[in-house]
Each structure stands twice: as C-alpha cells, then as structure tokens.
Amino acid sequence: MLNIFTLANGRLFQEEIESLEELTRFQPIWVDLENPTVEEKRWIKQHYGLSIPEDAMDEDIEESARFYEEDNGDLHIRSDFLIDDNEQPRSVRVAFILNLTNSDLKSKGVLFSIHDEDVPVFRLLRMRARRAPGLIEDAKEVLLALFDGDAEYSADTLENIYDELEKVSKQVLAGDVTDTRAGEVLGAIARQEDLNGRIRRNVMDTRRAVSFMMRSKMLNAEQFEEARQILRDIESLDNHTAFLFGKINFLMDATVGFININQNKIIKIFSVASVALLPPTLIASVYGMNF
C-alpha cells in the first residue's frame, strides 16, 4: 500500500496512490509504504530517483547500518515501533529515508517510511495532523512527531502494565493461592515482563534515532528543542521500566513461593499417610530391633 501526505493550510492530507500517474500529481512531504509491492517501489524509483533498499526492514541488519547519512545528504534511520494489541505484543521495524536535497522536492523535503504492517503511532499522527493545523510544517517534523508519538504510546502502555500488575498483586497478596491460580498469575506476569522489556528496548532505540537526528545538524532551533524534550520523556520512561522490572520480580518470587508452600503441604500429607499405612509386622520388627 502506498500513501502520500501533502501539506495544505497547516494540515496533512492523505491520498492512497494506485498508479505512477497519480503519484506525479502530488508534492508530498511524507510517502508511506506499507508492505510495498515491487511495482510501488518502481514508482518511487521512477518519480523520485530513490531506490528502496532490499534489506530496508531486515531485523538482522548490523547496528552500524541502521543510522547513517549518504553522500547526497539522505538520512537513513531504521527504528522499532511497539504494537500492543489483542495479539502477541511485538515490535515492527520501520525504515525511514529523509530526502532533503532533491531539487524536485523543493524546500520541504520528503520523508519515506517503509514497514510491513500498520503501526498505531502512525495512525495517531495521521488523525492529529488532520485536525490540528500547524502541527506539521515539513518532513523533519513528521519524523520527530512519529518518535514523539512512539514515546507517548510507550507511556500509555506502561500505564496499562501498572494496572495489570495491580490486579496480579491483589491475587498474590490475598494469600491461599492454588497451583492453578499460581499458573495463571505467572502467565500474566510473564506477558507484562515481555511487554515491559519491549518498551525498554524500543525507547532505547528511539533515543538513538533522535540523537542521530540532533547530531546531523539538520534541525532548526525549535526542532532541536523538540528533540531534546523527546529525550527527556524517554529518560522518564526508563525509570518506570526499571521500577516495573523490580515489581515483576517481586510478584514472580511471591507466586513461586506459594507454589513451593503448596508442594510442601502435599509432601507432608504423603509422609504422614505413608507412616500411618505401614504394615503392622514392619512396625513390630522395628520395635523389636530397637528394644
């Protein structure tokens, strides 16, 4: 799917592109390719002279190749975005190419984004940019807004983790936890631990991407300050993820402790039963041997 976003009266307007002819009629500041076809990549190559790398969304790409600037001034950034839905929480790799030097693109430049599936942060930005004039002024601000939205989405997800762990705490601290309930609790804790770890990794990734933009000296003073604010927000999120890891470990240890207590009770019952059911002749023999 190929969507382009043009800027008019301070708002972003979205158009779904289905042909090369359609693409040539617009001057977008953002071109978004979701699971692009070979033909859509060819349109980008023909119209913008930009080749989409074959490994654009490769998860195994070296860290040093995720953030770099080409000789022509194009910035390449590969960053992970969180998805927390009813399915398994996961991270989606998004490849960004920020083109600011092509004479055909004028001064606004164009941000190209390539990813395999829709990302909640992208949907949020599209909605806000349609309703709030002046939110976006150029391609660089689109990219900053996406990273800012990623930090906000991570913060919302952390709040959900707090809520879920609060429910787990009430079950664990209520006492008398059966093995069945303990298994359910451990499953819930493991899911929150995985989600918290993904958030911590994603915000670390976002920090690197924003820092790279700041070092590239492509941002004006206002955008630079916006980038610094994103980094401050991420630092705050780091503190929360660290606290949650401690809380998760405590709840997991407490739950495992209840499982051990239940097992000890069972062992004690079997021990008493085994003594009570010993054959009388064996008891008499033991009695005779000792006295």
Where are these regions (language model features)?
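Peripheral, non-transmembrane regulatory/ligand-interaction domains of membrane transport proteins
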Residues: M1-A221, Q229, D233-S236, H240
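Hydrophobic alpha-helical transmembrane segments and their immediately adjacent juxtamembrane loops
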Residues: E235-F291
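Long amphipathic alpha-helical coiled-coil segments
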Residues: A209-F224, L251-N262
